[in-house]
Amino acid sequence: MSLLLLVVSALHILILVLLFVATLDKSWWTLPEKESLNLWYDCTWNTTAKTWACSNVSENGWLKAVQALMVLSLILCCLSFILFMIQLYTMRRGGLFYATGLCQLCTSAAVFSGALIYAIHAKEILAKHPSGGSFGYCFALAWVAFPLALVSGIIYIHLRKRE
């Protein structure tokens, strides 16, 4: 049982790290010339000063939805980890981790929705930027976090507390 708890906790922490990096780092979209766009700032690489020059992102409604969903996924994932720890120490033997599992499933749905909106509406979100480029690693991390959170939620729902 302790190995299972260790694996489930490690999976949850991995999902949290993936979500933090995906939400806060600066590479949801990469353009030629080392320009990097994220959910919060548009950053360009200044070759003479060798620094990043960043400005606020557009006021696009779809981007605001992606921002809100990614922040919501982080909050839900943190909440589900806290719930798991509380349930682990207060729940009676034989109980199921329904609340934790439901929270993780909602995390998965929020990440899925945010990444899907960004993928579908990328042209609208990036309208003021030159064409070309590709999705960055933060976008990929969000898609990796989605199935992991889904599997984690299912595991929590089926997990019983034992001694």
Swiss-Prot record:
| Any Pfam family the entry gives | PMP22_Claudin
**UniProt name for this protein:** Epithelial membrane protein 3
Location of the protein in the cell:
Membrane
Which biological process, per GO, is one annotated for this protein? bleb assembly
| Residue spans crossing the bilayer | 4-24, 66-86, 100-120, 139-159
Q: Which residues are glycosylated?
A: 46, 56
Q: How does it sit in the membrane?
A: Multi-pass membrane protein
Keyword annotations:
Glycoprotein, Membrane, Transmembrane, Transmembrane helix
- Role this protein plays: Probably involved in cell proliferation and cell-cell interactions.
The entry's family comment says: Belongs to the PMP-22/EMP/MP20 family.
Q: What is the lineage of its organism?
A: Eukaryota, Metazoa, Chordata, Craniata, Vertebrata
